Structures are given as structure tokens and as C-alpha cells.
Amino acid sequence: MAKMQKKSINSPDETRTFDKGKFDLTKIGDTSIGKMYLEPGWSWEKCVKPLVKSQSCQASHTQYVISGRIRFKMNDGNEEEYGPGDLAYIPPGHKAWVVGNDPYTGIELGTMDLFHSI
């Protein structure tokens, strides 16, 4: 029988750093949760593409925005900007960048294992 668990997202199991950003990864039960920190000037094109070597991000994301703003552009040209309090589902085939001069902080739900290639 499964037991209840309690963990703090402020004490991650692992931290992944890369140019202008980091992901704090926490596993609880069979779910991965991540807290993302992206600096102004971060973009998928400049900071992640060189690491994963694909034309766009091939992972899906479910995110909750804590602070800052981020814009996603799908391969088909569709774009959407997200800010504090927004929930976002982003399917594979996109690029993203931080909008403005404020850092972006968000919670990534359930898909953080995909970031182990970073």
C-alpha cells in the first residue's frame, strides 16, 4: 500500500543548470515537479538548442507561472504569452523566450524527467 509523502520544492532532489537558467527537480510519488528559473535574455534558441541539438523543443510542458513572463511559439507559427497566475499546456514542437527585464519563475508539472538531457 502506498504511503503519503511530504517534500519541499525548496529542497530539490537535483538541480540542472544551463546558460541563463536552472531547473530544481523534485520527485514525489511517481510524479516529477520542477521549479524553473530563467533570467532575462533566456531563449530556447540560444540557451537550450545547442544542448539538445533539435530545431525546436520536442517535449510537452504543463506549467504554472509564478513570476515574470514567457512567450512560446509553436512550429506552426502560433504564439502565446504567459504571466503570473497562468497555467499553460505546451505541446511538442515549440520555442520559448523570457519577455521583458524580469526573471521568469514557474512550476513544471509531471514532465521534468524530460530535462535530464540538459
Which residue stretches match the model-derived regions?
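A short, N-terminal "cap"/entry segment at the start of jelly-roll beta-barrel domains
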Residues: 1-37, 45
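Short beta-strand segments in beta-sandwich/barrel cores
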Residues: 43-44, 68-73, 96
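Conserved short histidine dyad/triad with adjacent acidic residue
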Residues: 35-56, 79
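Short, conserved beta-strand element in jelly-roll/cupin
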Residues: 54-72
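Short acidic-glycine-tyrosine-enriched beta hairpin
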Residues: 74-93
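Conserved GNAT-family N-acetyltransferase fold
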Residues: 36-38, 63, 88
